[in-house]
């Protein structure tokens, strides 16, 4: 009985963790602008169109810059974003395996 209760608790903890992780992805994009309605003033429509333009520019913006090679990606994962680190291992390190 205790083993079954423990498995349910682990399942509930996993579900809560998944919900927390998924909620963090919900904030990845800005909220869509809301339409001002059919009988809005021209100024409200101008603000709405500016907000839509800004929204589209944010979600479709280009990613400029040099694409990294797989070696650079592995070095970034190993050494972090610090560019002062060498991508190659140190020479005094010898792998004994």
UniProtKB/Swiss-Prot annotation:
InterPro entries hit by this protein: Pancreatic_hormone-like, Pancreatic_hormone-like_CS
SMART domains per UniProt: PAH (SM00309)
Keywords: Amidation, Cleavage on pair of basic residues, Hormone, Neuropeptide, Secreted, Signal
Compartments where found: Secreted
GO MF term list: neuropeptide hormone activity; neuropeptide Y receptor binding
One Pfam family here: Hormone_3
Principal location class: secreted
Single GO biological process annotation from the record: neuropeptide signaling pathway
Residue numbers bearing the Tyrosine amide modification: 64
Signal peptide: 1-28
Propeptide feature ranges: 68-97
Gene Ontology cellular component terms for the protein in this record: extracellular space
PANTHER family: NEUROPEPTIDE Y/PANCREATIC HORMONE/PEPTIDE YY, PEPTIDE YY-RELATED
Listed name of the protein: Peptide Y
């Amino acid at each position: 009985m205790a083993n079954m209760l423990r498995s349910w608790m682990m399942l509930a903890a996993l579900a809560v963790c998944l919900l927390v992780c998924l909620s963090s992805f919900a904030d990845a994009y800005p909220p869509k602008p809301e339409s001002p309605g059919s009988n809005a003033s021209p100024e409200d429509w101008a603000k709405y169109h500016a907000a839509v333009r800004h929204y589209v520019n944010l979600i479709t913006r280009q990613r400029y810059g040099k694409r990294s090679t797989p070696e650079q990606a592995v070095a970034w994962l190993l050494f972090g974003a610090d560019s002062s680190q060498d991508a190659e291992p140190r020479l005094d390190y010898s792998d004994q395996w």
